[in-house]
């Protein structure tokens, strides 16, 4: 596999942006064990590749364990990820848990299965992290995913809420990180093509695609074509919030304002807006308890081993 200078610039950009996100949000610290969730899509392949490259030259020591969850979907090519992960030399685990049957049992035919499937998958990931002693869980969401989620919540949920680059799980046991938070989907797709990753289709479950997310994505791409850099600016706004110029009384004490107490941006009082010259670019439920870990596959020095583990 030969690469051009354009590829090396792309690779450098992705590594630089990922390293910056890790530093800005304190995603990975010395001594961490990071469970890298692998779906078989372009995002997770890119995330693992970049994290492995950064690990080699990082000033801190941290451990990577790649994980794939085989949800027993019909037609899932279960050999693809183990073969790829073995070729990289990374420590990995393959977890089999039949979430597919539970989803099919619970969700009526024709209805979207994504919500329940996601919840069950999340439960298995958390339990796997605990089993392996991983304190960080890395997901492959990128900048475009974060912006897309921001508009989904605003349009359909009435909230200014996106995907945080870093958050604690509800029980406080793990930290979830999104190392690709500064990376564009366009760059990730180009990198995945150049690296010839063995991509696994994402439609094996037969569930209807999230039409709302698709529409928002199409809207954003149309904006980007008309005004290149717009997605960068939207993402930049998520990192440059001014509570006093919104309308959330929980974020800013509007009732306590009085003359002579605070300076304000007077232009905004009269509806004026200041624009930048250039776009800103930033380098456990009962169902869960039914799941059983059928297999842990990890590559030892000679051959893979199989362990039995159950969820209590």
From Swiss-Prot:
Main EC class the enzyme belongs to: transferase
Keyword 4Fe-4S: yes
Location relative to the cell: Cytoplasm
Origin: domain of life: Bacteria
Sequence motif: PP-loop motif, positions: 39-44
Regions that span the bilayer: none
EC number annotated for this UniProt entry: 2.8.1.-
Lineage of origin: Bacteria, Pseudomonadati, Pseudomonadota, Betaproteobacteria, Burkholderiales
Official protein name in the record: tRNA-cytidine(32) 2-sulfurtransferase
Gene3D superfamilies registered for this protein in UniProt: HUPs
Provenance organism: Cupriavidus pinatubonensis (strain JMP 134 / LMG 1197) (Cupriavidus necator (strain JMP 134))
GO BP terms, alphabetized: tRNA thio-modification
